[in-house]
């Protein structure tokens, strides 16, 4: 029996096809002595047991090599006073510590009561390389909790840039969680757990889920993720393994004259950027590469051979090789002045179905960390205003936040230095 596909081409029946596959498999020798390996696109058996340290000077999820799955969730805080806010931060610390290190799922002693765990990971909650990074927004420092004098000096409410089309429902938040793991199941489980434990303290404001390719995640930072415009995203990132450089670029330090509690934290800029992918896919390759300033396949700056080659703008003052308004040239002109605007990018792609106009709703969850929001993201974005890429991208949400310093030990909790001032 045969079937026809949508083009009228005859296809063999499923039974005959499977029989043929079985015969082919039977004729192939099997190397039983070889070590079993994970198939491409799947995680190794040990990946579920990967874990990141929870205690330390800084929160995990900032310098951590990017995991495959990610979620941004902004919340409004429902706490009634400062004591309630402390209860929230202590509770979040406890949940983050357990979820990131793994353990047996709690049993429900009375079946007449709701289960203590969602159960979506089964009886054992594997760490799965989970990190949950807590950041606070400008609005947390209003009159509710008496924290205004302790607000980080550069923290501010995100305002509109010329190309923005911001949706108020997708902006800002008292707190923001960046949840990352090897698999989306673990990310979803973590969110469910946190919401279950904080019904009187937190209310979800907005949420977006992101991803990078599994092979990029498995490279542990050695392979640059590719965004949904088909270009490598994050090539020019500073080396996150260079502690001295991270002190200069990412972490707030004592010499910045910030409130003392902020030392060890970082300013976080979040932008939800929608791509016009159908329009982009109809754009000639040469124009795409001119807009970015890079070769689409290799990621190399135009006129160069390798992804991490450093462009020499001094030898191309008129932009004949790399256009003056190209993305990479505007974002980082590589001058002495632009050294102060370095930041660590940690972006993810998103795909949400279709818009009301029938266009694919795809884009970028842009996240970056820096020790100074004004010198970092804000300065870079001002340079990018009017770039050629704006025709294909539209920022629709996000916000500016401050990622809290880390938790020193089991007696400490996130935000303790802020709340005990």
UniProtKB/Swiss-Prot annotation:
Subcellular localization: Periplasm
Keyword Lyase (UniProt): yes
Keyword set, alphabetical order: Heme, Iron, Lyase, Metal-binding, Oxidoreductase, Periplasm, Peroxidase, Repeat, Signal
Residue numbers binding heme b: 234-236, 327, 332-334, 345
Post-translational modification: Predicted to be exported by the Tat system. The position of the signal peptide cleavage has not been experimentally proven.
Signal peptide: 1-33
InterPro entries documented for this protein: Dimeric_a/b-barrel, Dyp_perox_C, Dyp_perox_N, Dyp_peroxidase, EfeB/EfeN, TAT_signal
GO annotation, cellular component aspect: cytosol; periplasmic space
GO biological process: iron import into cell
Cofactor note: Binds 1 heme b (iron(II)-protoporphyrin IX) group non-covalently per subunit.
EC numbers for this chain: 4.98.1.1, 1.11.1.-
Reactions accelerated catalytically: heme b + 2 H(+) = protoporphyrin IX + Fe(2+)
Chain intervals for the UniProt region annotation (Disordered): 32-51
Required cofactor(s): heme b
GO molecular function: ferrochelatase activity; heme binding; metal ion binding; peroxidase activity
Family: Belongs to the DyP-type peroxidase family. EfeB subfamily.
Subunit field text: Homodimer. Part of a ferrous iron transporter composed of EfeU, EfeO and EfeB.
Purpose of the protein: Involved in the recovery of exogenous heme iron. Extracts iron from heme while preserving the protoporphyrin ring intact.
NCBIfam families in UniProt: Dyp_perox_fam, tat_substr_1
Name by which UniProt lists this protein: Deferrochelatase
Organism: Shigella flexneri
């Amino acid at each position: 029996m045969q079937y026809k596909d949508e083009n009228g081409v005859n296809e063999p029946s499923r039974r005959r096809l499977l029989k043929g596959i079985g015969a082919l498999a039977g004729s192939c020798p099997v190397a039983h002595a070889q070590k079993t390996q994970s198939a491409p696109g799947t995680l190794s058996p040990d990946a579920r047991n990967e874990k990141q340290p929870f205690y330390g000077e800084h929160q995990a999820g900032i310098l951590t090599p990017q995991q495959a799955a990610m979620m941004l969730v902004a919340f409004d805080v429902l706490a009634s006073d400062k004591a309630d806010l402390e209860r929230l931060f202590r509770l979040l610390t406890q949940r983050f510590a357990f979820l990131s290190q793994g353990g047996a799922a709690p049993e429900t002693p009375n079946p007449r009561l709701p289960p203590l765990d969602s159960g979506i990971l089964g009886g054992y909650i594997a760490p799965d390389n989970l990190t949950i990074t807590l950041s606070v927004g400008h609005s947390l420092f209003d009159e509710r909790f008496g924290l205004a004098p302790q607000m980080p000096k550069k923290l501010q409410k995100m305002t509109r840039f010329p190309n923005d089309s911001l949706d108020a429902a997708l902006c800002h938040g008292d707190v923001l969680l960046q949840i990352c793991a090897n698999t989306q199941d673990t990310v979803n489980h973590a969110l469910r757990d946190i919401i279950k434990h904080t019904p009187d303290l937190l209310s979800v404001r907005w949420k977006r889920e992101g991803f990078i390719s599994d092979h990029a995640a498995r490279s542990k930072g050695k392979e640059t993720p590719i965004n949904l415009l088909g270009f490598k995203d994050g090539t020019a990132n500073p080396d996150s393994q260079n502690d001295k450089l991270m002190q200069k670029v990412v972490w707030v330090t004592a010499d910045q004259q910030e409130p003392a509690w902020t030392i060890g934290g970082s300013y976080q800029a979040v932008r939800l950027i929608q791509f016009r992918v159908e329009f982009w896919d109809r754009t000639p390759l040469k124009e795409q590469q001119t807009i970015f300033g890079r070769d689409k396949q290799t990621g190399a700056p135009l006129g160069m051979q390798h992804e991490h080659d450093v462009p020499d703008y001094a030898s191309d003052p008129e932009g004949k090789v790399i256009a003056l308004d190209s993305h990479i040239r505007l974002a980082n002109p590589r001058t002495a002045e632009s050294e102060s605007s370095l930041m660590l990018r940690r972006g993810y792609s998103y795909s949400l179905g279709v818009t009301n106009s029938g266009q694919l709703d795809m884009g970028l969850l842009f996240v970056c960390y820096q020790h100074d929001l004004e010198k970092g993201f804000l300065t870079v974005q001002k340079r990018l205003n009017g770039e050629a890429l704006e025709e294909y991208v539209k920022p629709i949400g996000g916000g500016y936040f401050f990622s809290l310093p880390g938790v020193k030990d089991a007696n400490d909790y996130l935000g303790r230095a802020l709340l005990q001032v």
